[in-house]
Every structure is written in C-alpha cells, then in structure tokens.
C-alpha cells in the first residue's frame, strides 16, 4: 500500500515544476496526511495558485484546468489510487485555516 512518505516525496519532486507554472503551495491532506488511510482511501492534494501567473504561463484558463487534471492523473497513475486536488485560492480564510490544520505542505 502507498505510504504518506512516498506521496510527500513525489510531491516534493514535482514542486519546482509546479511552482514555476504558478502553484504557490502544495501539500497532502486527508486520510494519508493523518496516517489513517486504508485500502479504499484516495489521495487528497491541496494547492494554492497564482491564477494570473498560471494563465500567463499556460496560455488560457482551460489549459490551467487541463494542466492540473494531467497532474492529478500522473499522481493517480504513479500510485494506482484515485486523487483529488483541492485549490484553496478562492476559499474563505476560515476554510483555508481549517484545511491547513491537517495538511502537510512540501
């Protein structure tokens, strides 16, 4: 079974590339971050983005969505587990704070 350490190492290996595009925070939350994963757990990734930078670097909002979906698929393919990506950019400060309490950022 996939471990928290394996996921965090992979996210760390992708950090520079993602940050160049416009991701400003990258982390793991949910059951894997809490060490409570089981055979049915998905991988929950939290990001924060500079939307203007991402559109500038990728060319259009559609290509930003495509890029993030491709990243989600690459994580899922690597670990053979479903992956959810949560972008906190437009969340309220309170919601971000609650999510951040359980997140492990790389």
Residue ranges and their predicted role:
Residues 1-25, 33-39, 52-106:
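Catalytic core of pol beta-like nucleotidyltransferases
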Residues 28:
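Conserved histidines in hydrophobic membrane contexts and catalytic metal-binding motifs
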Residues 46-48:
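Short hydrophobic/aromatic beta-strand micro-patches
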């Amino acid at each position: 079974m996939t471990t928290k350490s394996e996921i965090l190492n992979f996210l760390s290996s992708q950090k520079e590339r993602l940050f160049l595009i416009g991701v400003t925070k990258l982390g793991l939350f949910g059951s894997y971050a809490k060490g409570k994963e089981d055979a049915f757990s998905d991988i929950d990734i939290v990001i924060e983005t500079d939307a203007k930078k991402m559109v500038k670097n990728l060319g259009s909002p559609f290509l930003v969505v495509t890029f993030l979906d491709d990243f989600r698929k690459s994580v899922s393919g690597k670990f053979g587990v479903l992956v959810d990506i949560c972008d906190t950019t437009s969340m309220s400060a309170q919601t971000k704070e609650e999510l951040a309490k359980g997140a492990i950022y790389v």
